[in-house]
Swiss-Prot record:
Disulfide bonds join 56-72, 180-197, 206-230. Keywords: Disulfide bond, Hydrolase, Protease, Secreted, Serine protease, Signal, Zymogen. The record marks 204 as: Required for specificity. GO terms for biological process: proteolysis. This is Trypsin beta. It comes from Drosophila erecta (Fruit fly). It is found in: Secreted, Extracellular space. It catalyses: Preferential cleavage: Arg-|-Xaa, Lys-|-Xaa. GO terms for molecular function: serine-type endopeptidase activity. CDD domains: Tryp_SPc. Residues 1-22 form the signal peptide. The lineage of its organism: Eukaryota, Metazoa, Ecdysozoa, Arthropoda, Hexapoda. SUPFAM superfamilies: Trypsin-like serine proteases. It is an enzyme of class 3 (hydrolase). One of its GO terms (cellular component) is extracellular region.
Amino acid sequence: MLKFVILLSAVACALGGTIPEGLLPQLDGRIVGGTATTISSFPWQISLQRSGSHSCGGSIYTDRVIVTAAHCLQSVSASSLQIRAGSSYWSSGGVTVKVSSFKNHEGYNPNTMVNDIAVIRLSSSLGFSSTIKSISLASSNPANGAAASVSGWGTQSSGSSSIPSQLQYVNVNIVSQSKCASSAYGYGSEIRNTMICAAASGKDACQGDSGGPLVSGGVLVGVVSWGYGCAYSNYPGVYASVADLRSWVINNA
């Protein structure tokens, strides 16, 4: 969960008009309209913590590597980070492991949010169990409309500064790159080939914890990246596309 919003008035000059329609990416990881769940249903989910407080979500790729979003790891040192795995609660239970290092995608651009992916290396190995499991990386993007789920400890309402203690999830449907960039939605050319979208029909839900998992067909298909807020039906949640960034993750894990 990233507790800030990039405001138009603050950064319009810096972006130099790269974002059309006068809108800027809003990084406000949250699960709105979600349901409490247990870690056994999402055993790859971790809480990325900065100085002991939850800051982002992530997914277990191997027993020593976590996949998360690059925007979660800006202006932070590895020594201040740890992860909690194997617990439905971000503040207790399971196991905590210190972060030894991390690497952001070299092509990550905070203005366009392209290549918004990173790998975290742990100081010791996770012991796999029914509540701590790795998840495979998608090798191709799911079809438009495919069922998916997103999980995390994001704030449950727009503008809220508090987060739930228990893991939340929401069911969504994939919106393909081409569909998300089409006139059916409002993003247009902001959707790049390293992104995939998802939306929840009939719910006020768009995205979960920043850096957290979007899962479809039992594999990791997306990493929660950005969006224009859950109130707008023509702006789905936007995720880093794992299929398009798979090679980078494998080569840098």
